[in-house]
Amino acid sequence: MPRIIKNDSIIDDNWQVLTLAEGDTPESLRLPAEPALVPLAVWLARRDELIATQAPLGVWLDSHEGPEALAADSARFAVIGVNFPKFTDGRSYSNARLLRERYHYVGEIRALGDVLQDQLFYMRRCGIDAYALRGDKDIDKALAGLRVFSETYQAAADQPQPLFRRRIAREAA
């Protein structure tokens, strides 16, 4: 079973990530009985069918897809994946932050695709709390990468108060 990092721990991943192969349509994709992350196109085409299954729901966004399509339904999802098709494509950082801050999504946001240790700390800052690393990377070393920085200066999705405000609050207490 594959493993992921979730909430600063390494766990077994029981979610299957479904993709549309060339020639597949959202309507033709076979849905498994076990928990699955479906592409946004499948969710949009088969929303009622997926809701009726009563199984845990998960959807993933490719980097060129925006989270606004999920705004009304975000509370239905146990997991929303954000895909990083390559290291240099940072649009999914924005998608994660929008999910947390604009759409108030409180479930798991999982980084998928070309996910490397160097990115994890910054992904967390944007609200991502689970990471499916690229297959050739060491998950134990990557977990250590989340602990590189002990303090953050700026406000972000994972820490709404900047450092100077946290210091003032500590001194006042």
Give residue spans per PLM region:
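C-terminal helical cap(s) of enzyme catalytic domains, especially alpha/beta-barrels
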Residues: 140-167
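Active-site-adjacent beta->alpha loops and helix N-cap segments on the catalytic face
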Residues: 42-49, 87-99, 140-147
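Glycine/Thr-rich beta-alpha phosphate-binding loop at enzyme active sites
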Residues: 56-99
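Glycine-rich phosphate-binding active-site loops on the catalytic face of alpha/beta enzymes
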Residues: 126-147
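Structural preference for beta-strand elements that scaffold enzyme active sites
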Residues: 35-37, 56-58, 77-81, 108-110, ...
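A positional/architectural concept
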Residues: 14-61
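Catalytic cores of alpha/beta
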Residues: 59-61, 67-72, 117-130
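Short beta-strand/loop segments at the ligand-binding rim of alpha/beta enzyme cores
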Residues: 52-59, 98-111
